[in-house]
A protein has these predicted regions:
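Juxtamembrane helix-boundary/capping and inter-helix hinge elements in multi-pass membrane proteins
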Residues: 95-100, 112-113, 146-155, 182-189, ...
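Hydrophobic mid-bilayer segments of alpha-helices in multi-pass membrane transport proteins
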Residues: 20-29, 37-59, 81-87, 227, ...
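Membrane-embedded alpha-helical segments and adjacent helix-loop junctions characteristic
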Residues: 66-152, 385-471
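Re-entrant/interfacial helical elements at transmembrane boundaries that shape
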Residues: 137-145, 161, 174-185, 430, ...
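Transmembrane helical segments that form the transport core of multi-pass membrane transport proteins
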Residues: 281, 288-446, 450
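Alpha-helical transmembrane segments of multi-pass membrane proteins
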Residues: 115-127, 153-166, 187-207, 410-411, ...
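Juxtamembrane and boundary regions of transmembrane helices in multi-pass small-molecule transporters
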Residues: 2, 169-279, 488-551
Length: 551
């Protein structure tokens, strides 16, 4: 069997190597923003260029490049595309049944103001879903709901991507932080605590920024009390839970606290001027729907919350472990020609020796978020009284609408894994470590690049965690700070990740318009990560005592 040892400076000059490694990303940017290509075309060109660079510059065997491409494409299909298919199917069932109109009226009974609706659904409810399931599902569900409530598709998708910034670090029950902590050998609570301190200000800022994007400073002034309640309750709960409970629950706790606090506050206060993004006059005629009908209308999303809570319980997860009752539903397919035949080298491994890693495609039929959402959709068919023939028609319609987004997601993940397994992405990160004292400014950018490439804060943390730690040790910086910078920088890259862009466009019916959405979010993402670099530098050199020490 062939072995491949990753080379991080193939051209003998780290900056020249980094320039070559940057070419596929630049091509993706240009394809979307300048040439205005569809998402799948931009992704195909980027993965093709990365494959050529992997073979010709990084000397990766062609067969390994092919296997990396296939592994990434399959991972894009399952579990990621499956999550989005199930989420959109659930939403469409609600619309098909007619009960979504009742749900819409009940939401509008809380407030008719679109600015506050985006905070309640995109920020609060989206954060809860991110804290529980992650993987792009929150963006798909919340963006689709906002379109149903009257916001434009591009607006809904872009605002939900920005709203998703605050909870990503603690997404999927804290896996981004706990996985990195395990990989680098530091207590997860320390990274969680530092992340909570930094994200306190991000979480305070994001809701106000969303309102600003919708209606400028006038909008902030008109909605300040409600937005402040949402932002402060979220940031406060996130800070306390991340510092005292660990990384698993802050995403869920902060979202629920903020959602309840804001909804209760709106019982007693409403903005004097009701803002509608569609320009229509705000009007609401109270319907005489029986309370039971309102409960039925909300039932798909209530059941979704309950099933998600069940899915993350330890006793339920134990059913899928070896010899568990449902272990038969887990399938494993090892890619023999790359599994344990690709070797990472220092500084991406702590030892002085190269280290290989397994490459196994995990096809979990039941123990995956997409299946949990699909199960909710099946239950909702009964509750909403949707006929089987209608449900099958809706599912077929969903698959038809998703065919290009599925292709885009698959190609994006192929690009990610070709870049990761060849060493291309590692070259970019390694170049930034050569900035010496300015490394604190570029440290969040490494996490940002990682999430742009992989679409996942967890993957970015696993990919670059050791590099952040070892560079901090070499430069005598607090390693908890650079590890946190990787996590937080990653959250700021989520809004422009090709995977996230494809998911958001699919959810709101903008497949093929990925360039428009990318153009909407990229400028804010770049500004935010630059500001975060300044914040990390200020902490490192002015107030390092706020960083938890490893004991």
């Amino acid at each position: 069997m062939l072995e491949f040892h990753q080379i991080y400076d193939p051209l003998g000059n780290i900056w020249l190597s980094a320039l070559v490694a940057l070419l596929p990303i630049l091509l993706f940017f240009l394809s979307l923003m300048v040439f205005k290509l569809k998402g799948y075309a931009a992704a195909f060109l980027s993965v093709a260029l990365s494959a050529i660079i992997a073979v010709l510059v990084y000397k990766m065997p062609v067969s390994m490049v092919g296997s990396s491409f296939l592994y990434g494409f399959l991972y894009g299909l399952w579990p990621i595309a499956w999550i989005i298919i199930a989420a959109i199917f659930l939403y469409k069932l609600s619309v098909k049944s007619g009960y979504f109109e009742i749900l819409k009226e009940s939401v509008q009974s809380i407030t008719l103001d679109h600015r506050i609706l985006v905070i309640l659904i995109g920020f609060c409810f989206g954060s809860f879903l991110e804290g529980a399931i992650g993987f792009g599902g929150p963006i798909a569900i919340t963006a689709a709901i906002l379109v149903g409530l009257g916001l434009s598709p591009l607006y809904s998708a872009g605002l939900c991507l920005i709203a998703n910034t605050a909870p990503v670090a603690f997404g999927a029950v804290g896996i981004p932080i706990s996985a990195m902590a395990s990989a680098v050998g530091v207590p997860a609570i320390l990274i969680s605590a530092m992340t909570g301190k930094i994200l306190f200000f991000v979480s305070l800022f994001v809701p106000f920024f969303i309102v600003f994007l919708m209606d400028g400073f006038k909008g902030i002034k008109e909605t300040f009390p409600a937005v402040f309640i949402a932002a402060f309750s979220f940031a406060g709960a996130q800070f306390l839970s991340s510092n005292y409970l660990g990384p698993e629950l802050p995403g869920i706790i902060s979202a629920l606290v903020s959602l309840v606090a804001t909804a209760l506050f709106l019982k007693f206060w409403q903005p004097k001027v009701i803002f509608r993004s569609d320009g229509k006059a705000a009007s609401f005629t109270k319907s005489n729907h029986h309370i039971c009908k309102i409960y039925v209308a909300w039932s798909p999303f209530v059941i979704l919350v309950l099933v998600i809570v069940l899915w993350i319980q330890p006793f339920f997860k134990a059913l899928f472990e070896k010899d568990g009752l449902l272990a038969f539903s887990n399938f494993y397919f090892e890619f023999n020609n790359i599994s344990n035949h690709i070797f990472k080298s220092p500084p991406f491994v702590e030892s002085d020796q190269s280290a290989s890693f397994p490459v196994v495609f995990k096809f979990f039929l039941i123990n995956t978020v997409g299946t949990s959402i699909f199960l909710v959709a099946l239950i909702s068919m009964l509750v909403l009284r949707v006929r089987v023939s209608d449900a099958m028609s809706v599912f077929g319609e969903t698959l038809k609408e998703m065919r290009y987004p599925i292709l885009t997601i698959g190609l994006v993940l192929s690009f990610a894994y070709v870049s990761n397994y060849s060493g291309i992405s590692s070259t970019l990160a390694l170049a930034l470590t050569h900035t010496e004292l300015a490394f604190t400014f570029f440290s969040p950018l490494i996490g940002w690049v990682g999430v742009f490439l992989t679409g996942s804060d967890t993957s970015s943390n696993l990919l670059f965690g050791s590099l952040q730690q070892l560079t901090a040790q070499r430069l005598h910086l607090p390693e908890i700070l650079t590890l946190t910078a990787n996590t937080v920088g990653g959250t700021l890259g989520k809004m422009i990740s090709p995977q996230s862009i494809a998911i958001a466009c699919a959810a709101v019916g903008l497949a093929g318009k990925e360039g428009d959405l990318f153009k909407f979010t990229v400028k804010y993402s770049l500004i935010f990560v630059a500001i975060m670099g300044v914040v990390i530098s200020a902490i490192a050199y002015l107030i390092p005592e706020v960083v938890p020490a490893i004991k």
